[in-house]
Amino acid sequence: FQGTAQYQKHENDAALTTFRKGVGQIKPDSNPDIVSDFYAIMGDILHEKGLNDEAFQAYDSCLQWKPDNTAALNNYAYYLSVENRNLAKAEQMSYKTIKAEPSNSTFLDTYAWILFQEKRYEEAKIYIAQAIRNDSTLSGVVKEHAGDIYAQTGDMEKALEYWQQSLEGGNTSATLKKKIQQKKYIAE
């Protein structure tokens, strides 16, 4: 629990050290929810530090203890998709999250983004539209993804509208600004 407290206070290095020690204490009869959460947080921290291979190992361990940990499934799937790695696995994990929580805009956005990475743009458009309908935060990332998806389906007017909304919502990405200026999709 010390590691969780450190993580919540953004003391990520200390939290990672604590979790690594804690993982050494895991027994076969340990509480699977707690162990899964330990590994999930480790995965998040390792990803933030740019240690993606280690992060993915932590997520794999997390899911061995609790295969339906939706937060870990979503994060793992999204991080794989951003790297354009193992998209079939990412899609399977993400699909589990939208089945568990069909109106969760974050999960819908992740699933749409994976479909985008797989060049399944029309399907991606269906899920990003659902994400936007359910997005109470009006996330700049979701809006940028929507713009990217619409651009790839040939609807530049809609793409520009979403990119502009993303920019107005506080997204400061230099790539986003180029997309708007050049009126075309640009990969990150």
What are these regions (language model features)?
Residues 4, 44, 78-79, 113, ...:
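Residue-level recognition of tetratricopeptide repeat
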Residues 10, 50, 84-85, 119, ...:
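Residue-level detector of the short coil/turn that links helix A to helix B
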Residues 1, 41, 75, 110, ...:
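Canonical tetratricopeptide repeat
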Residues 32, 38, 72, 107, ...:
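TPR alpha-solenoid repeat register
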Residues 7, 40, 47, 81-82, ...:
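Position-specific recognition of the canonical hydrophobic site in helix A of tetratricopeptide repeat
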Residues 27, 67, 102, 136-137, ...:
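Short coil turns that delineate tetratricopeptide repeat
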